[in-house]
Amino acid sequence: MTTRSIPHLIIGFGKAGKTLAADLAKHGESVILVEQSAAMYGGTCINIGCIPSKLLLVEGEKSARLTDKSAAFQAAMQRREQLTSALRAANYNKLATIPGVEILTGTARFLSPNVVEVLTEDGACQIEAERIYINTGARPATLALEGAEDKRIYDSTGLLQLDSLPARLVIVGGGYISLEFACMYAAFGTEVTILEQGDTFLAREDRDVAEAMLAMLADRGGVKVVLQAETKRFISAEEAVTVVTSQGEYAAEAVLVAIGRRPNVEALHLEAAGVQLTPRGFIQTDEYLRATPNIWAMGDVAGSPQFTYVSLDDYRIVRDQILGEGKRTTKDRLLLPTSVFTTPALSQVGMTETKAAASGRPYEVKRLQTVAIPKAKVLGETHGLLKAIVDTETGLILGATLFCPEAHELINLLKLAMDHQIPAEALRTQIFTHPTIAEALNDLFASN
């Protein structure tokens, strides 16, 4: 077995890993990046996450004008494959052509804090690295229940790659991933049922927001949400698979299990490197994302919020220690905007009304129904509402929840205002173009 020495070893071709590799090489450093699968060059987002799922949401909306939903679905899947293949190749070629970067396709495991064994198709080699960065991501959690081996039971990756449109889809789990897939498949004409084990729908959201989401789901494709539905087992039959729950039985041609994600750490043999895990199984790091004196973890595997843009910010934190002043930490990102790409999108930043009430701070709630926005009427998208929490003493925005068209774009404007302490009054009087969703901020912050 050959042994090689390198200043930097990156395990995982995700957003943080690939960006760090390119940056280090452009500063004259030598880097080896190891990726387990050629099908994952570029990471989760472009291959089995953000990009293909959003494409299918868009294609689903387009299919509303078509009568042959099955053909539209198959065409959408072909476009998904074309797009992800192109992005995967572009990501590989962009990195592989940078002098100083070498990409190995294989599995990596630690032998010691500085030595990693990499097994490729050509055999095994040992890599001794001064600094090692782990960016292996996460994968969908599974259910170890009777009948779960049925091939019609999918995780999110599998449901993005179906060959044919199911007439019925049952989704186990009522979280944000479930909502996106519900909207996606309902748009293509699939009958969708969401099974939520808890007794509260979208427990982290304000009740008026959750109720607005329920109303939208019911209106758009008749998505059904069942609460307190604990999944017990699956029953396989030739024509369908049945999900047996505490609230009854639900048959479908496809079942999605969307109950969270688990870190990809098992194959790494982290104990050999002295790397510790959190109680939830993610890599334990400090505020600089350092797991040991010479090992860093970035992205989902580090327990960071599971968004591509957070993985990118993780890169910035680690990069600052290697190439910068070393001052940037996870504590610097106080405000994190989020978006759920339902139809319309649900986006949030800062405090919700529920959190504001628990904080003890003086506040008022600004509220505007989406139906009051002229551009929403033009688009025919009048579901939802906009909410903002404003400090009554300072006039500063404490948080916002937007459930309306273009919410995923508009939330970034509100985050920017909050970051720079721009008062709500400035948005109330700001001149916006018309007709736009952004101009609704005038009315939102003028509301009582």
Model-derived features with residue positions:
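Rossmann-like dinucleotide-binding cores of NAD(P)H-dependent redox enzymes
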Residues: 42, 82-89, 160-161, 166-170, ...
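A Rossmann-like FAD-binding core segment of flavoenzymes
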Residues: 102-105, 109-120, 189-287, 351, ...
